[in-house]
């Protein structure tokens, strides 16, 4: 196994990009794409072939959970980094939708659009990493959160990192007479895996420093550690034990099922950590229920309270 090669990874795990990269070995059976030794079986429903049906249920469940989290974040009107966290969650929804498209065969691997959707998926996951790092630095309050300047810096940074990864993926997948092609995937591996792993590591270290030296709240440290545990467990189940899981489950699910589930739990822990270290700055909580005003400009509750003494 050479550095940057997906040959060994794709032999064990049915990653979406495995259908658009080639084995390093020129004598491979397929001109393009690496078929894993074991992968989840497909299901035919209404003359439509659906791949990774178990993974699809996890994605739909993840979308519901993220919508609930977004509702809770929007309710914390004055919390630090509220808009930035909402942007992170919107990116997470985009990533799950793109994963549904490439995992479940909405765009078949044989179609010309498949490579573009895989590039979008990798680009969104990269943008999600840089957005998470920005949210982590925001908690140190080096700059004002929620302002137009802060949001535009976040948007431009995420779009730039998305564009870089997207372009690297497309050039690698399409082989447009460049130094990159579907057999030379070292650059793709560095951008999609190595650099994003470094970004996530910096985020985790920064949040541990924030909790230990600034907040001194060890309950929130537990949320960080749980998030790291779920993320690492998902990567291990996806890239190491996928083949064994697939064979043990009789091809019904593989490592992608458990990896996607662990990613959803990771999103939940990221939100929980943010929720624990932030609070509303209002003196009184803000309710979403509007109070009716009578013709004298007095609310119903105010009228009842004043009538007790006057």
Swiss-Prot record:
It is a multi-pass membrane protein. Disulfide bonds: none annotated. The chain crosses the membrane at residues 50-70, 86-106, 114-134, 151-171, 194-214, 221-241, 257-277. Keywords: Cell wall biogenesis/degradation, Endoplasmic reticulum, Membrane, Protein transport, Transmembrane, Transmembrane helix, Transport. InterPro entries: Chs7. One of its GO terms (molecular function) is unfolded protein binding. Signal peptide: none annotated. Its main location: endoplasmic reticulum. GO terms for biological process: cell wall organization; chitin biosynthetic process; endoplasmic reticulum to Golgi vesicle-mediated transport; filamentous growth; filamentous growth of a population of unicellular organisms; flocculation; negative regulation of filamentous growth of a population of unicellular organisms; negative regulation of flocculation. One of its GO terms (cellular component) is endoplasmic reticulum membrane. It is found in: Endoplasmic reticulum membrane. Chaperone required for the export of the chitin synthase CHS3 from the endoplasmic reticulum. Interacts with CHS3. Belongs to the CHS7 family. This is Chitin synthase export chaperone. It comes from Candida albicans (strain SC5314 / ATCC MYA-2876) (Yeast).
């Amino acid at each position: 196994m050479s550095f940057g090669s997906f040959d060994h990874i794709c032999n064990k795990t049915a990653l979406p990009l495995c259908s658009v990269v080639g084995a390093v070995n020129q004598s491979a059976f397929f001109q393009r794409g690496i078929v894993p030794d074991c992968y989840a079986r497909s299901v035919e429903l209404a003359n439509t072939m659906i791949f990774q049906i178990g993974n699809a249920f996890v994605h739909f469940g993840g979308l519901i959970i993220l919508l609930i989290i977004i509702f809770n974040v929007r309710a914390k009107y004055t919390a630090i980094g509220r808009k930035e966290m909402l942007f992170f969650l919107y990116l997470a929804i985009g990533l799950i939708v793109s994963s549904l498209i490439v995992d479940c065969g909405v765009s078949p691997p044989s179609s010309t659009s498949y490579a573009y959707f895989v590039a979008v998926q990798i680009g969104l996951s990269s943008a999600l990493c840089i957005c998470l790092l920005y949210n982590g630095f925001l908690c140190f309050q080096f700059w004002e959160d929620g302002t137009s300047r802060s949001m535009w810096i976040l948007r431009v940074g995420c779009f730039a990192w998305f564009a870089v990864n997207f372009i690297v993926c497309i050039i690698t997948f399409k082989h447009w007479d460049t130094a990159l092609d579907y057999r030379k995937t070292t650059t793709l591996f560095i951008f999609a895996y190595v650099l994003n792993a470094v970004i996530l590591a910096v985020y985790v270290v920064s949040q541990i420093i924030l909790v230990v030296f600034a907040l001194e709240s060890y309950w929130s440290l537990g949320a960080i550690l749980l998030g790291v545990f779920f993320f690492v467990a998902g990567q291990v189940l996806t890239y190491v034990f996928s083949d064994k899981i697939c064979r043990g489950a009789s091809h019904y699910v593989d490592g992608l099922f458990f990896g996607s589930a662990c990613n959803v739990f990771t999103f939940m822990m990221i939100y929980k950590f943010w929720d624990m270290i932030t609070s509303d700055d209002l003196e009184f909580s803000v309710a979403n229920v509007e109070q009716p005003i009578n013709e004298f400009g007095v609310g119903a509750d105010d009228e009842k309270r004043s009538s007790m003494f006057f």
